Amino acid sequence: MGRFIFVSFGLLVVFLSLRGTGAGFCCPLRWSSYEGHCYLVVKEKKTWDDAEKFCTEQRKGGHLVSVHSREEADFLVHLAYPILDLSLIWMGLSNMWNDCKREWSDGTKLDFKAWAKTSDCLIGKTDGDNQWLNMDCSKKHYFVCKFKL
């Protein structure tokens, strides 16, 4: 019996020590994984700034979602639609025309675009057409957070 407890304790220590290293490549509870990143659909409306702050507080490296391919955009729609139905979600671009900024809030390059119009802050539609629209940053919308595993 003592040996069983010792082995069980040892396995628990190993599991806990590996948990923070990315060894399991698993996303936290309520987060979904895609291509080495974790995504969280948040069904609480916030301004762009408050949504970005919320995402950065959830996980180290967390930000509003950045999208780098049509496949990732499709994944995002399939993830968000069942939770948010036909909604608009904040994405990680803001003040891009005022500051001539061409990167996502997570610092990654803007290498995939699906513009509908120019904007101060960027929202995406969850209805499957993957269009991005302009929106006043002070409006409140649902959002998706993302971080790299």
From Swiss-Prot:
Keyword GTP-binding: no
Localization: Secreted
PROSITE patterns linked: C_TYPE_LECTIN_1, C_TYPE_LECTIN_2
SS bonds (residue pairs): 27-38, 55-145, 121-137
Coiled coil location: none
Pfam families: Lectin_C
Signal sequence residues: 1-23
CDD domains membership: CLECT (cd00037)
Domain of life: Eukaryota
GO cellular component: extracellular region
Keyword Secreted: yes
InterPro entries referenced in this protein's UniProt entry, alphabetically: C-type_lectin-like (IPR001304), C-type_lectin-like/link_sf (IPR016186), C-type_lectin/snaclec_domain (IPR050111), C-type_lectin_CS (IPR018378), CTDL_fold (IPR016187)
Predominant localisation class: secreted
PANTHER family: MANNOSE, PHOSPHOLIPASE, LECTIN RECEPTOR RELATED
Family: Belongs to the snaclec family.
Protein name according to UniProt: Snaclec agglucetin subunit beta-2
